[in-house]
A protein has these predicted regions:
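Short acidic, S/G/P-rich loop/turn micro-motifs used as interaction or catalytic elements
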Residues: 13-22, 63-76, 102-105, 328-331
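Conserved N-terminal alpha-helix of the aminotransferase class I/II PLP-enzyme fold
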Residues: 190-239, 741
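Hydrophobic/aromatic residues positioned on beta-strands within the core alpha/beta folds
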Residues: 98-99
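Non-catalytic terminal extensions of PLP-dependent enzymes
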Residues: 32, 46, 51-59, 70-81, ...
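Conserved PLP-enzyme active-site core in the AAT-like
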Residues: 41-44, 48-53, 85, 109, ...
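Conserved acidic segment of CheY-like receiver
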Residues: 3-31, 39-40, 60, 269
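Conserved acidic residues
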Residues: 56-59, 114-120, 128, 228, ...
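A short, charged/proline- and glycine-enriched loop
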Residues: 1-7, 55, 227-228, 252, ...
Length: 746
């Protein structure tokens, strides 16, 4: 397949009628005759912005005239040096040629010269020869870009082989036989459909057996991610977590789990028949889940939890796995080296669910606050696993995930045993585009480019925070939005890691007395706080702006956020973020403020929402905010939601046994008013925040029941802003919505 990567020529005379302009255009024409596109420009412009275009080029030709290489006029040399440095900051391999008249390499500073692939003298060799020289280097560069699996897949898709195997669309041909299929084909395109193949294509290797180009790509990714073993997973980190667990946990094993874990970890507990003991995180009244205090990780405290668990028959059994959410949804990180020091050898496997942290290993900013990195010491006895969603913050397609493994000094991964669990959870018909995106996402993070991508994400996140503070200073005398995070930020540049440490009893985070150096906040995760609630859980008597209304407004104005809480919403600065995106966010928030202050009617500012829910048509934006704020305040919802997550969850059955009751239909569908004391057979997960509240086998307490009653009343009063609780069963009886939970039968 031919990719579009033009040769970029930068020459101030490119469009001039002088001899220099004529010469460079003749060279450009010779390159085009050889089949390469040429992009000619007359100046560097914004050096940084232009250098970023290296990702779209196959080579650069930089022109410099004799009169510019003189000591009296160093500007041209300095501009050349700056541009070359900007290119090399991002890309060490792309060919750079210097095009001049009579001066030679001895006239060019050595720090510039050593970065060049060649020096082209005008009017010496023929343009045709020089063009072939440039194209040879450009082709070699382009050939080096594709990682193993992606290269094999593009070759296969371009090869023109007839497929007499599945999938049934046969390279997209089936879609051409139907009008709606034609639409599908035109939307997704020839390449994606030709590359959608099955494991019958031996030349692409096998994901399930880790052979051929697939294996080569996994080895390449392991090198890039600084781990001993790496496995691509095509159906998300939910599956990666289950693979890790099924490879090491059996029925009756004791496991130590972050209570703030993803539901896939709880599913793993149910599937394996494990006996969980939970480490309890902190939580502030904004609804932000904080870190697990360091004391919870102390071995003596873990032993006490095991001894207190009624289902742990062998109180001295060694836990098989520790699973920690790293980072939390809101960006709180743990110092992994301290956890390793505390628990090495005491727990067989230390598993870090890093679905939201695949970028950390590529920048020194994150230090020891991620699981596996370059020059990080091994555990002596415990294996380290990291499960990462490359689709969340890097460039993987949706569901692209990977498992990273670091061997211990005394224990190495048994790849054959591990692969049995991998086979259990991996489709025999994996999506090859996802495999390719895992491959490419890893290759993109190769230094120096990956480091630059992460640094740019951090810088954009910091610039967003600074912009929001600037608006607050200039325009927010009455009210404005806050960005959750440390108060003292510099005006320019990237912050030191120390600035993002969560220090004991600092009011901004609200997590209390935290251990020094144990936690930090990832700056690329930004939680915007709306007015009306403080970190202590006290509601404003004057006014409040619930976040659900703000994010509904943003959505109708083309800005979609990641997560919405009571008075906060969450956005991420991934490697795909742009200045245009976050500046549009700032502008949209300013427009919201203006519409709120004017109390604009919803039919005007939220027309789609008002059309769907006509009861709100004539309601003012400020009035609606006041109504929902009043309900939240009256029910003290911030404290209620905090207390229910921190309340005592009593295990009455093993999770596996309770779930089995549901599978056998040995359940009662219980009204929420009658839930107190009943044992749930299902996961109960309120959104926000999307963290499971109860797991099968635990009993409902009064606080949780009170929250469910509130959710029922709120949903009836404010349709369109419903509190979603997974695990609740809604049934309409006699025109009235009734809510139930499936519980273990009495």
């Amino acid at each position: 397949m031919k990719f579009r990567f033009p040769v970029v020529i930068i020459d101030e005379d490119f469009r001039s009628e002088n001899s220099s302009g004529l010469g460079i255009r003749v060279l450009a024409k010779a390159i085009e005759v050889e089949g390469f596109e040429v992009l000619g420009v007359t100046s560097y412009g914004d050096l940084t912005s232009f250098a970023q275009q290296q990702s779209r080029a196959s080579a650069f030709i930089l022109s410099i005239d004799d009169e510019e290489i003189v000591e009296e006029k160093p500007e041209a040399i300095e501009q050349l040096r700056t541009f070359v440095n900007e290119i090399r900051y991002r890309n060490e391999e792309i060919p750079i040629f210097l095009h001049g008249e009579t001066r030679t390499s001895r006239h060019i500073p050595n720090d510039v010269l050593r970065e060049l692939h060649g020096f082209i003298h005008m009017n010496e060799d023929t343009p045709e020869f020089v063009a072939r020289l440039i194209i040879r280097e450009a082709k070699a560069y382009l050939d080096s870009l594709s990682p193993p699996f992606f290269k094999a897949l593009t070759h296969y898709a371009a090869d023109g082989s007839y497929s007499l195997h599945c999938p049934g669309h046969s390279g997209g041909v089936a879609f051409l036989k139907s009008p709606v299929g034609q639409m599908f084909h035109q939307f997704f395109g020839e390449n994606m459909l030709r590359a959608d193949v099955c494991n019958a294509v031996d030349e692409l290797g096998q994901l399930l057996d880790h052979t051929g180009p697939v294996a080569a790509s996994e080895r390449n990714a392991a090198r890039i991610y600084n781990c001993d073993h790496l496995y691509f997973v095509t159906n998300g980190t939910s599956t990666s977590n289950k693979i890790v667990w099924n490879s090491t946990v059996a029925p009756g094993d004791i496991v130590v789990v972050d209570r703030n874990c993803h539901k896939s970890v709880l599913h793993s507990i149910i599937m394996t028949g494990a006996i969980p003991v939970f480490l309890m995180p902190t939580r502030n009244h904004f609804g932000i889940i904080g870190p697990i205090p360091k004391a919870e990780f102390e071995w003596e405290n873990i032993k006490k939890k095991i001894e207190a668990n009624p289902f742990a028959t062998d109180k001295n059994a060694k836990p098989r796995v520790l699973t920690i959410t790293q980072s939390t949804y809101d960006g709180v990180l743990y110092n992994v080296e301290e956890i390793k020091e505390m628990l090495d050898g005491k727990i067989d496997t230390l598993h870090f669910d890093e679905a939201w942290l695949p970028h950390a290993t590529f920048h020194d900013f994150y230090g020891d606050y991620h699981a596996i990195g370059a020059d990080r010491p091994r555990c002596k006895k415990s294996m380290i696993f990291s499960t990462q969603s490359t689709h969340k913050l890097l460039a993987g397609l949706s569901q692209a995930s990977q498992i990273l493994v670091q061997d211990a000094d005394s224990i190495q991964l048994d790849r054959d045993v591990f692969n049995e669990a991998y086979l259990m959870h991996t489709s025999t018909s994996p999506q090859y585009s996802i495999i390719a995106s895992c491959d490419v996402a890893a290759a993109m993070m190769e230094a120096p480019g990956g480091t630059v991508l992460v640094e740019e994400s951090i810088m954009e996140a910091l610039d967003f925070r600074r912009a929001m503070r600037k608006v607050d200073e200039e325009w927010g005398a009455d009210w404005w939005f806050k960005v959750w995070g440390p108060n003292d930020l510099s005006e320019e540049g990237i912050e030191e890691r120390e600035a993002w440490m969560l220090k004991a009893n600092e009011r901004w985070h609200g997590f209390g007395n935290l251990a020094e150096g144990f936690n930090m906040l990832d700056p690329i995760k930004a939680t915007i706080i709306t007015p009306g609630l403080d970190v202590d859980g006290d509601f404003s008597d004057e006014f409040g702006i619930p976040a659900a209304i703000v994010t509904r407004y943003l959505a109708e104005h083309g800005v979609i956020v990641e997560k919405t809480g009571l008075y906060s919403f969450f956005i991420m600065f991934t490697i795909g973020i742009t200045k245009g995106r976050w500046n549009t966010m700032v502008a949209a928030l300013q427009q919201f403020k203006d519409d709120y202050d004017k109390n604009q009617p919803l039919w005007k500012v939220l027309p789609e929402f008002a059309a769907k829910f006509p009861r709100y048509e004539r309601t003012g934006l400020k009035d609606l905010c006041a109504q929902i704020h009043g309900i939240y305040k009256h029910n003290d919802v911030a404290r209620l939601t905090t207390e229910m997550y921190l309340s005592n969850m009593v295990p009455a059955m093993k999770p596996t046994d309770a779930f089995a009751k549901m599978a056998h239909r040995e359940i009662d569908r219980v009204l929420i008013d009658e839930l107190e004391g009943r044992i749930t057979a299902v996961l109960l997960t309120p959104y926000p925040p999307g963290i499971p509240l109860l797991i099968p086998g635990e009993q409902f307490n009064a606080i949780i029941v009170n929250y469910l009653k509130f959710a029922r009343e709120f949903n009836e009063r404010f349709p369109g802003f419903e509190t979603d609780v997974h695990g609740l069963v809604k049934q309409v009886m006699d025109g009235k919505a009734m809510y139930f939970v499936d519980c273990v039968a009495d």
